[in-house]
């Protein structure tokens, strides 16, 4: 008779992996925030005055006729971590390539923030993000309580496509 038992050694590899992934994502989130601040110093006002923000350190996007994007991020109100979020996007139209970018969504007030937290938040095709480059945020305002900025990380993508972004929110326990 063959018997397999598990010995408890005080180590749960699943918990360690989760903790390691958490540390990696925390570093990536901090690096993304630093990148947004450094690319456009005038973005400081959004960080100071916004009720909250959702930041996605890496959104991977690709397409060949039909495309998609996915990213995971963190959601803050007044610099306090409230939870995590995922971003999904499906597009159709003329598109070819792949790219990675960072995305940040600022929420002007509690109403906009709560809409994000308590529903399946979605941006339609008519809402667009602004590329965060020096000085651009000085001329950018909120639309429907949100302001969205992106920074390219890598890749090249040609597209004339239509699609929206859908978000989910998972509060901290």
Segments the model singles out, each with a brief description of its role:
Residues 4-9:
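Sec/Tat signal peptide C-region and signal peptidase I cleavage site
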Residues 10-173:
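Small-residue-enriched, tightly packed secondary-structure blocks
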């Amino acid at each position: 008779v063959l018997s397999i038992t598990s010995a408890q050694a005080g180590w749960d590899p699943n918990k360690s992996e989760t903790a390691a992934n958490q540390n990696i994502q925390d570093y990536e989130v901090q690096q993304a925030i630093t990148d947004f601040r450094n690319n456009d110093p005038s973005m400081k006002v959004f960080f100071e005055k916004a009720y909250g923000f959702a930041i996605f350190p890496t959104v991977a996007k690709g397409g060949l006729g039909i495309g998609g994007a996915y990213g995971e991020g963190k959601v803050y109100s007044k610099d306090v971590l409230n939870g995590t979020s995922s971003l999904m996007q499906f597009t159709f139209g003329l598109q070819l390539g792949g790219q990675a970018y960072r995305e940040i969504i600022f929420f002007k007030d509690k109403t906009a923030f709560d809409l994000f937290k308590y529903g399946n938040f979605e941006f339609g095709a008519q809402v667009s993000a602004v590329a965060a480059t020096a000085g651009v945020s000085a001329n950018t305002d909120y639309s429907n309580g949100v302001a969205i900025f992106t920074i390219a990380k890598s890749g090249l993508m040609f597209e004339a496509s239509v699609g929206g972004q859908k978000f989910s929110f998972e509060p901290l326990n």
